[in-house]
Amino acid sequence: MHTYVTQELPAVINANFSFDERQGLMGHSMGGHGALLIGLTQAVPFKTIAALSPITNTLVNEWTIDAFTRYLGPDKEVWKQYDSTELVKSGVGKHVSIRVDYGSLDEYSDLLKCDEFEAVCKANGYENISFHCHEGFDHGYFFISSVIEEVLKDQYQRLTRE
């Protein structure tokens, strides 16, 4: 999926549409996790990242521990390259503009760990990351449909800033 998002899809888009270098990436939940990983570790092609209710700390997430053990083996040091919180602790990705949105009533907040991720970002001097907790929203479709316009407008503004 990483190669598809960072190489194959941009190549198809650039071959068929008129685009410049101002490109952003957005994802929700596990897709938000992927968007954060790509944003933190890739200098190009994405200048902005929007992560909606992202999984931010895979090392302590019961959803990912079993999968990581099966796919990557038991060594948690190997897993760190796939954990946004660990990447921020190592100082990578300060160049990209990132926005994180999540609902205050997200039933998976204990797994997403957005609050902890925000604290780690602040402690490590990440100035290009903003966090937006939306009161009364959970993890689902209504949350996404309610915030998507605001998030897209923000992505556009961040992409067109010089």
Task: Locate the predicted segments by residue.
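Non-catalytic cap/lid and distal C-terminal segments of serine-dependent acyl enzymes
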Residues: 1-162
